[in-house]
Amino acid sequence: MAFLALGINHKTASVDVRERVAFTPEQLVDALQQLCRLTSSREAAILSTCNRSELYIEQDHLSADAVLQWLADYHRLSLDELRASAYVHEEHEAVKHMMRVASGLDSLVLGEPQILGQMKSAYAVAREAGTVGPLLGRLFQATFSAAKQVRTDTAIGENPVSVAFAAVSLAKQIFADLGRSQALLIGAGETITLVARHLHEQGVRRIVVANRTLERASILAEQFGAHAVLLADIPQELANSDIVISSTASQLPILGKGAVESALKQRRHKPIFMVDIAVPRDIETEVGELDDVYLYTVDDLHDVVAENLKSRQGAAQAAEELVSVGAEDFMLRLRELAAVDVLRAYRQQSERLRDEELQKALRLLANGGNPEDVLAQLARGLTNKLLHAPSVQLKKLSAEGRLDALAMAQELFALNEGSTDKSPQ
């Protein structure tokens, strides 16, 4: 086996380079087939996300330079430019790297779960392209198992490490069933987009996006089946909102105490969960003084994120140990599998010799031969034939002074000095 894992990621390459080395979903099947054809790779898979583009390859002989040249040519980059950002892992280190990636240990956000799904998609596309064989098939399954064990046996994925996810996690603590809740999101930037995605994934009943311009609110709302309104419509929406999360660039507060008091009266003081992620603040601090309002600021969330990141870093050490064990186990099984073909051929050869001697013995018995003599001849003949080829090779190795091979043969046949018969002196 000659196995390679190579590519670029957020730690080694700028966004500009990552964009140029990324593969679109439509390119992948053709790229995989071309990669195998032009680089003498027997098996290949490509993982391409916003933070990394990696190639997993099995070859007869390691040829990282040829693969890097292909990658540079495919994306019309200079080889020197690509080489400056690329990393190459071989054999055991390549297996370990692949398992670390799938477990979220190499991610921009430590322990993020999306990468495992992306790895599974890479495997599915490679199977579709016909570039997955015995090695990658086994390796992907071992990788998925290792990542699952990391998720199950460590706390690396349990605590949110983004402000958006932390906000949604706090909402889940207050509302046991988000599927019965309505959310009002104020703003339409990157953070609110992440909040909308997390809420949508949690099955929130209804999402309303309020923004200064209806066009931007509508673009975001369409992604998650939400409803778009203007900032001026917030008072009407507030009374129906169980969750309010705001993140705008406004220099003045958007929500005041009076508007929230009015909404609470209409809600008959049913609680409202509010998160103000904006700096400067979108929600007046006095709103937090109201009964039935749970108001959190960006600083509150940063404390949660920092504590959770510390927890994840502690869990990462245990996860690294699990990945190391998983990689070692895979390499051990792979080395054991390497003997399967040899053992199969040796068994077939032995069975052929056995059948030849057995047929000879049956003919002798049919012609009236003495059974004891026939059995003795069968045993001698089979022993001689089984030992013939090894004997010839051992004599040849001895004549060549290959003492290492002789020692290996002694170990192979479980021989030692005390096990051989010695003639009387």
Curated annotation (Swiss-Prot):
Sorted alphabetically, which PROSITE patterns does this protein's record hold?
A: GLUTR (PS00747)
By what name is this protein known? Glutamyl-tRNA reductase
Q: How would you summarize the oligomeric state and partners of this protein? A: Homodimer.
Which Pfam families does this entry report, sorted A to Z? GlutR_dimer, GlutR_N, Shikimate_DH
Q: What class of enzyme is it?
A: oxidoreductase
The site feature described as Important for activity is recorded at: H97
**Organism name:** Pseudomonas putida (strain ATCC 700007 / DSM 6899 / JCM 31910 / BCRC 17059 / LMG 24140 / F1)
InterPro entries found in the cross-reference section: 4pyrrol_synth_GluRdtase (IPR000343), 4pyrrol_synth_GluRdtase_dimer (IPR015896), 4pyrrol_synth_GluRdtase_N (IPR015895), GluRdtase_CS (IPR018214), GluRdtase_dimer_dom_sf (IPR036453), GluRdtase_N_sf (IPR036343), NAD(P)-bd_dom_sf (IPR036291), Shikm_DH/Glu-tRNA_Rdtase (IPR006151)
EC numbers: 1.2.1.70
